[in-house]
Design a protein with these regions (language model features):
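Phosphate/nucleotide-binding beta-alpha loop and adjacent structural elements of enzyme active sites
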Residues: 1-223
Length: 223
C-alpha cells in the first residue's frame, strides 16, 4: 500500500510541476482570467482548479471527481473556497451509477474502459450525470470555460445531446484519446461538429503519444 501511495505522490508532483512551473496550459490563461464560470472535469486531480483560482480569484469553479478517496482529498484541500463547487460524480452520456476501472497508482488514468493507460485496475461504483442534467439542475445558462479529461469517455459526452450543450460553452479544452479505428471514425464526426460550433479550433499534439491530443476551441460570441 505504501508503494502505491508513494507512486501517487510522485505522479501528483509531476502534474504540479507541469501546471505551476512549466505553465503547460498558459495558452488558456486569458480565457480563464476572464471567465465567470469554469467546469473542471477531472484533469490533474484538483490542481487545475487551483491554477484557475490562482489566475482568477472571483470565478466560480465546478469541480467533478467521481472516485471517493480522490474526492475526499480534493475536499480537504479546497474546502475553504466557497466558490469551488465540489461534485462527487462524473460527466457522462447518461445519468446513473456505473463501474469505473480505477488505476490506483495514477487515478487520473481511470476510466469506464481498460487500455494501456490503466492495465491494472480495481472496479469501483461511481455516480455519473449528463452535462445537460447538471446545467438544468443548477440553473446554469452558460459555461465560460470547460476543461475535460475523462479518458476516452469524451466521445460519449461530445456526441450526446451536443446540440443543447454546444450552445452553452464559450471555451473548450478536451483531451482526446484515439484508441482504435472506431474511435478515429467517431472523432471525425465529432470534430466536424466542434468546427461548426466554435470560431477557432486548434489541435495541440501530445509529446508522449500521437493518439492522445488536446482540442482547444473558442467562440467569439454567443449564439
Amino acid at each position: 500500500m505504501n508503494n502505491i501511495k508513494d507512486k501517487q505522490l510522485k505522479y501528483e508532483k509531476a502534474l504540479e510541476y507541469e501546471i505551476f512551473t512549466k505553465w503547460e496550459y498558459s495558452f488558456a490563461k486569458s480565457k480563464i482570467q476572464n471567465a465567470n464560470c469554469i467546469f473542471d472535469i477531472w484533469w490533474h486531480i484538483w490542481l487545475f482548479s487551483q491554477w484557475c483560482r490562482f489566475l482568477n480569484d472571483k470565478t466560480r469553479i465546478h469541480y467533478f471527481e467521481p472516485v471517493g478517496d480522490s474526492y475526499n482529498k480534493a475536499k480537504s484541500t479546497l474546502w475553504n473556497d466557497k466558490n469551488i463547487i465540489l461534485n462527487n460524480y462524473w460527466i457522462a452520456s447518461k445519468s446513473g451509477k456505473w463501474i469505473i476501472l480505477l488505476n490506483q497508482e495514477k487515478t487520473m488514468q481511470s476510466s469506464k474502459y481498460s487500455s494501456f493507460l490503466n492495465p491494472i485496475w480495481k472496479e469501483i461504483e461511481c455516480r455519473f450525470i449528463t452535462l445537460q442534467d447538471y446545467l438544468i439542475g443548477n440553473d446554469i445558462d452558460k459555461i465560460d470555460f470547460l476543461k475535460m479529461d475523462i479518458e476516452w469517455m469524451e466521445f460519449e459526452v461530445l456526441s450526446s445531446r451536443w446540440d443543447f450543450e454546444r450552445k452553452k460553452i464559450n471555451s473548450l479544452i478536451s483531451e482526446i484519446h484515439l484508441m482504435n479505428e472506431k474511435m478515429e471514425s467517431e472523432w471525425n464526426q465529432i470534430f466536424l461538429k466542434i468546427k461548426n460550433t466554435f470560431w477557432n479550433v486548434e489541435i495541440i499534439n501530445s509529446k508522449y503519444r500521437e493518439e492522445i491530443f488536446l482540442i482547444w476551441a473558442n467562440r467569439v460570441s454567443w449564439l
